[in-house]
Amino acid sequence: MAGSQIKIPLPKPPDSDSQRLNAFPVIMAQEGKGRLLRQIRLRKILSGDPSDQQITFVNTYGFIRATPETSEFISESSQQKVTPVVTACMLSFGAGPVLEDPQHMLKALDQTDIRVRKTASDKEQILFEINRIPNLFRHHQISADHLIQASSDKYVKSPAKLIAGVNYIYCVTFLSVTVCSASLKFRVARPLLAARSRLVRAVQMEVLLRVTCKKDSQMAKSMLSDPDGEGCIASVWFHLCNLCKGRNKLRSYDENYFASKCRKMNLTVSIGDMWGPTILVHAGGHIPTTAKPFFNSRGWVCHPIHQSSPSLAKTLWSSGCEIKAASAILQGSDYASLAKTDDIIYSKIKVDKDAANYKGVSWSPFRKSASMSNL
């Protein structure tokens, strides 16, 4: 059985926008009881290389409603029926070219027609049927997908509320647009993340998030209390990469060896909204050969939080957060080795103190640019 953990402390880097993911403010429409205003959230995350092409990630948040029933006769004065909200939902439109007009983006949402169905295989799934999307997003990933299948617990807040025999529609209310460098768009293939071998050691990453919530709120019961009294603390883990086991029997592969490897990689972590709330990791130094498949050619990798912790990701749909600290943990890769060895923790992961100073787009990070009624 593993013994105590070994920790290498480091003071926390300065605060910055790249550490935070702010929640959308709740703004009610003056007309229409209980009607939220549509809003757009804009942010830039750039690699620092002026030659790197810029793209936009568009992510949507909204609500699933039952499709309104149509009557036999409809007059000119008939009001559009709005059915009650069933549950909240998230759907990513994916990456595409840079979009220049925030107001146009909000108005274009009226042209969206996305149907929602529930199904199952080895677990519950949600099927999004893309009947129509705004022409503005024709070059984004969603335009190539007529059907999107996903795990229900990752994209729907309360999938248990969706029942058989009811037709559902997804209504977009919040639009999150991230202007980023094309080199940031990299995720590791799931089979590679899931593979375990006795020939390597696994490097995990723990990110501690300070989530904005009240101490007496329901979500606070599932998190740690913040010693600074500014919210609650949530821990989320990712499989970062693998390191080859050393074969030199005269060398000690301890925390000093691991710290040296991590220090040479020069790891930096930040947070953004790409495939939903997403942790971005950049290796700015030497990447060991065994670890290279886990990063792209420029040293970037993205880890959507919903892949590791769906419940935490759904909490962040409506709550802001910031990165409190990040650590890398060295473990045995196969379960037999994992059970017999201590975790070696490297706490010197830097939190990116600010976005790259590139002024290709004049949008300020997380500035609410425009809003309109959710009709």
UniProtKB/Swiss-Prot annotation:
Q: Name one GO biological process term.
A: virion assembly
Coiled coil start-end? none
What are the disulphide bonds in this sequence? none
Q: Matching InterPro entries, A to Z? A: Matrix_C, Matrix_N, Matrix_Paramyxo_C, Matrix_Paramyxo_N
Cellular compartment(s): Virion
Which cellular components does GO assign to this protein?
viral envelope
Main location, first listed in the record: virion
Source taxon at top rank? Viruses
Q: Which GO terms describe its molecular function?
A: structural constituent of virion
- Entry keywords, A to Z: Viral envelope protein, Viral matrix protein, Virion
**Role played:** The M protein has a crucial role in virus assembly and interacts with the RNP complex as well as with the viral membrane.
Q: Which family does it belong to?
A: Belongs to the morbillivirus/respirovirus/rubulavirus M protein family.
Give the protein name, as stated in the record. Matrix protein
